[in-house]
């Protein structure tokens, strides 16, 4: 386990990135969302490892995301857990849970995930997400 001081420093680095990621996601603002990522960017979900370059995340990509979320009645998501489990000066592992909500405030689903943030090109960004969401 990392020391309390290391975890506190990692939280100062990671939480603003995760907050910005969720804000961009909820707005379906592709540019804001991408600004929180490092590329290539990876997502492991439903047994499939997805790999995206910056150029892969375009209007067609966000349209697919919007359609998929609309199909489940999604309106917004919130973080319900963010715990630093491992950290260094170049990488942070964050055990997360997020909850998806409908417009009326009812829960669509809650999913556990692991987010890996890396320090590249002078900034922290999300490099990998491993999620139990579909």
Model-derived regions: residue spans:
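Short, cysteine-centered beta-strand-loop-beta hairpins and adjacent loop/turn segments enriched
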Residues: 100-108
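A solvent-exposed, acidic/Ser-Thr-rich amphipathic alpha-helical stretch
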Residues: 30-84, 90
